[in-house]
Amino acid sequence: MYVQPESGFERHMLVWLEEDGWRAVQGLARQEHKPALKLWEGQDWPAVVRRMDIDARDDEVCLGLPLPPDENSGEKVRVSIRAHVGHISRAAPAVDLRAALRSSGPWRERLAALERDAAGMGLRVYGSLAMQALTGLLYVSQNSDVDVLFHPTSRKQLDDGMEVLSRHAAQLPLDGEIVFPGGQAVSWKEWRMAIAHPAKVIVKELRSVRLADTASLLATLEDA
């Protein structure tokens, strides 16, 4: 039986549902979403943890199924679902950057260079690149970003990581978030601007979105 991690769920985590979970989700789904849900269940692909709905219960987790862009219109559909924690078979962090390299197409060499320079940083990816790596379906286009997740534990690691991301952003369409302890996520580009020109930043958490000053977030990191 799945046991929820002590640290709780975090946005962009991956969640696999048991058969009963898919059955419950299908029972509440809109008709146009049912084929995608059936495909996800049949392939045993994970759903992605998203911010909790305001009326979600404590024993639920809110999830998303980002579908591939429409071949003709390019429209992106994200199927929003909820699952009971008891219907989860397993959960995992977002996709490791190294694991996504094989699915990165024209970015592969440049992403491999980022992965080498970011050794020890534990970079992960979400969004189009992650979904393409997980499913084998076509998500990445010439307009896609590379959404990275960076979980620093110390101020030095944060500074080093920001230097690496800023340098490689000249060669890659890098986007994504710094995730401070407790799942407090900030756009790494917004953080860079706020450090250069002091300002509050938007912090995204599992249950809320708020403004915070950079000092309060830095205080959650180790000094070394």
For each predicted feature, which ranges?
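Mature, function-bearing regions of proteins
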Residues: 78-86, 191, 196-219
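Active-site nucleotide-donor binding segment shared across nucleotidyl transfer reactions
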Residues: 112-146, 150-154
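Extended catalytic-interface subdomain
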Residues: 221-224
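Helical scaffold of the NTase/Pol beta-like nucleotidyltransferase catalytic core
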Residues: 1-128, 161, 166-172, 176
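Conserved beta-strand segments of the P-loop GTPase G domain that flank and frequently precede/overlap
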Residues: 64, 151-152, 179
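Short, glycine/charged-enriched secondary-structure capping and boundary segments
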Residues: 138-141, 164, 191
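Short acidic, Gly/Pro-enriched loop/turn segments at secondary-structure junctions
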Residues: 155-159
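Conserved catalytic core of two-metal-ion nucleotidyltransferases
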Residues: 168-203
